[in-house]
């Protein structure tokens, strides 16, 4: 899957995590935008077009659950795949994310190969769903 055509939004309040993730994804050919909190993420989502969101849960201003809930409630944004990337490894948190509409859930630190395959799988599912419409 050619990644150059895809634009990803990385939402994480930790600068080191944002930088590491965005550099890794850019090396794979993705266009990457970073947001430092939930409110900024929603502002970007309402201004620009993204193919996938990598969303942390523990964010200032507006947490990842709130962002996910608003994103999935907005018909113009609800079809964007969301992969949760968080240090939280609780069954309740994972279940809540899936109930709110997350497409996948990765616990930090995660393997770069796993991340790459999960992103590809989400993008392929979205592409197939759009082709079927």
Write out the residue ranges for each language-model feature:
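C-terminal output helix
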Residues: 110-119
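Charged docking surfaces used in two-component/phosphorelay signaling
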Residues: 19-27
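Short hydrophobic/Thr-rich beta-strand motif most characteristic of the beta2 strand and flanking loop
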Residues: 29-36, 44
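The feature encodes the CheY-like receiver
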Residues: 14, 18, 60, 69, ...
């Amino acid at each position: 899957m050619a990644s150059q055509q895809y634009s990803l939004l990385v939402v994480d309040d930790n600068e080191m995590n944002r930088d590491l993730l965005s550099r890794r994804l850019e090396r794979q050919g993705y266009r990457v935008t970073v947001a430092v909190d939930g409110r900024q993420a929603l502002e970007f989502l309402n201004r620009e077009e993204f193919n996938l969101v990598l969303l942390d849960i523990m964010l200032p201003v507006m947490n990842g659950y709130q962002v996910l809930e608003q994103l999935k409630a907005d018909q113009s944004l609800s079809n964007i795949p969301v992969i949760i990337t968080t240090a939280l490894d609780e069954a309740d948190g994972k279940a809540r994310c899936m109930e709110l509409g997350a497409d996948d859930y990765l616990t930090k630190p995660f393997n770069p190969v796993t991340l790459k395959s999960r992103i590809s799988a989400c993008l392929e599912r979205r592409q197939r769903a759009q082709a079927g419409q």
